[in-house]
UniProtKB/Swiss-Prot annotation:
Record keyword Membrane present: yes
Organism encoding this protein: Bos taurus
Protein name: Solute carrier family 2, facilitated glucose transporter member 8
Transmembrane segments: 26-46, 71-91, 98-118, 128-148, 159-179, 183-203, 258-278, 294-314, 321-341, 369-389, 406-426, 440-460
Bias (Low complexity) ranges: 11-20
Length: 478
């Protein structure tokens, strides 16, 4: 066995006597890091209340037309894709802690530019900056938290990444009821500012420090996080932290988690989650909710409640079980969604443009209201199922399955895949509905959910209760 193999497969962080650490400061450090995902969620949710506010804005404030509003929402995903690449580069060179500190800067700068915006280009520039920060935070925060957490709480703390994302989205929706777009952007500066402040007092992850052979700093970090540092092993002296090389993809400990990580990110976006979110307000309108903006808040509350539930049971139920159950729920709910659109579809049209409100707004009011409640139930079931499994777990597994020496590149590729697929699905879903009709598009999403369940059962290992080094050893076949 080579020194590199020893480093990747033996526990770097082994407590004396095999006992589990019980330090409480690890929760403080995880909270500080999770303020990045909270900022990320707020940036994602910002566009929903801000776009109507900008459309109402009187000169000289910038005004959004339909095309500009589309870009105002979508440009975040492009910035985040770039942020994923940059975050992967920073992760191994600047370290986990400094990467989180640095990602706070484009968050604050982006919201500050939006606050001061006098034209469309400033708005888009600010959104691009916040998107860049979203990409970095979505990569670095899960890795930081997974590397400071001991196995007994890694699922709980790792799931808090997605919990903070959906909490940030919900906060943006709620604040949007009382704040105009400029003040909403000011509020967006608060979470990353707190993260910047708190992370200055948090340690670098012990695993990263040990991989750099900074023994004393690693011992100090362990003492801070877990309360003691005696008896923990340093990697063999011959094991040096190495950059990623393409030849390493021949190793099963590298290519297997690569395939799993990329596939999970792709299946997450192909599940139809963005389409369901996009049409939430239309569905609530058809169910006769007078204030359709209530849809956003209801969706946000469901996400928060069920993501919190997932966090609490993650280390007992396990990743595979929750992914499988989540996928099954999503299969049935997207199938029901497609059935709703099939039953409410209007007659033949000469127009090639799919106008969803027209498709679901026919004259048979009583019948349609009943069917709309079917859609509302299906939508809520889908969101609950997604929040329990396919929402948080791909991000959690991404932070667990890669060995240290490829983690920066590998997680960067996974995040890039996720954001690129999000952009592609969001932009092309309307075109897909023109070809397949809305019911066909959602039935296709249901098929992808089935493939996701089968992939989970066939390829995804259980990681609960294992050290990160034991997970790597599993992929290496040792």
């Amino acid at each position: 066995m080579t020194p590199e193999d020893q480093e990747e497969t033996q526990p770097l962080l082994r407590p004396p006597g095999g006992s589990a650490p019980r330090g409480r400061r690890v929760f403080l450090a995880a909270f500080a890091a999770a303020l990045g995902p909270l900022s990320f969620g707020f940036a994602l949710g910002y566009s929903s209340p801000a776009i109507p506010s900008l459309r109402r804005a009187a000169p000289p404030a910038p005004h959004l037309d339909e095309d500009a509003a589309s870009w105002f929402g979508a440009i975040v995903t492009l910035g985040a894709a770039a942020g994923g690449v940059l975050g992967g580069w920073l992760l191994d060179r600047a370290g986990r802690k400094l990467s989180l500190v640095l990602c706070a800067l484009p968050f604050v700068a982006g919201f500050a530019v939006i606050t001061a915006a006098q034209n469309l280009w400033m708005l888009l520039g600010g959104r691009l900056l916040t998107g860049l920060a979203c990409g970095i935070a979505s990569l670095v925060a899960p890795v930081y938290i997974s590397e400071i957490a001991y196995p007994e709480v890694r699922g709980l703390l790792g799931s808090c990444v997605q919990l903070m994302v959906v909490t940030g989205i919900l906060l943006a929706y709620l604040a949007g009821w009382v704040l105009e777009w400029r003040w909403l952007a000011v509020l967006g500066c608060v979470p990353p500012s707190f993260m910047l402040l708190l992370m200055c007092f948090m340690p670098e992850t012990p695993r990263f420090l040990l991989s750099q052979h900074k023994h004393q700093e690693a011992m100090a970090a362990m003492q801070f996080l877990w309360g003691y540092a005696q008896g923990w092993e340093e990697p063999p002296l011959g094991a040096q932290h190495q950059d990623f090389h393409v030849a390493q993809l021949r190793r099963p400990g590298v290519y297997k988690p690569f395939i799993i990580g990329i596939s999970l990110m792709a299946f997450q976006q192909l599940s139809g989650v963005n389409a369901v979110m996009f049409y939430a307000e239309t569905i609530f309108e058809e169910a006769k909710f007078k204030d359709s903006s209530l849809a956003s808040v209801v969706v946000g509350v469901i996400q928060v409640l069920f993501t919190a539930t997932a966090a609490l049971i993650m280390d007992r139920a396990g990743r595979r079980l929750l992914l499988t159950l989540s996928g099954v729920v999503m299969v049935f709910s997207t199938s029901a969604f497609g059935t709703y659109f099939k039953l409410t579809e209007g007659g033949p049209s000469n127009s090639s443009h799919v106008d969803l409100p027209a498709l679901v707004s026919m004259e048979a009011a009583d019948t349609n209201v009943g069917l709309a409640w079917l859609a509302v139930g299906s939508m809520c079931l889908f969101i609950a199922g997604f929040a329990v499994g396919w929402g948080p777990i791909p991000w959690l597994l991404m932070s667990e399955i890669f060995p240290l020496h490829v983690k920066g590149v590998a997680t960067g590729v996974c995040v890039l895949t996720n954001w690129f697929m999000a952009f592609l699905v969001t932009k092309e879903f309307s075109s897909l509905m023109e070809v397949l009709r809305p019911y066909g598009a959602f039935w296709l999403a249901s098929a992808f959910c089935i493939f996701g369940v089968l992939f989970t059962l066939a390829c995804v290992p259980e990681t609960k209760g294992k050290t990160l080094e034991q997970i790597t050893a599993h992929f290496e076949g040792r």
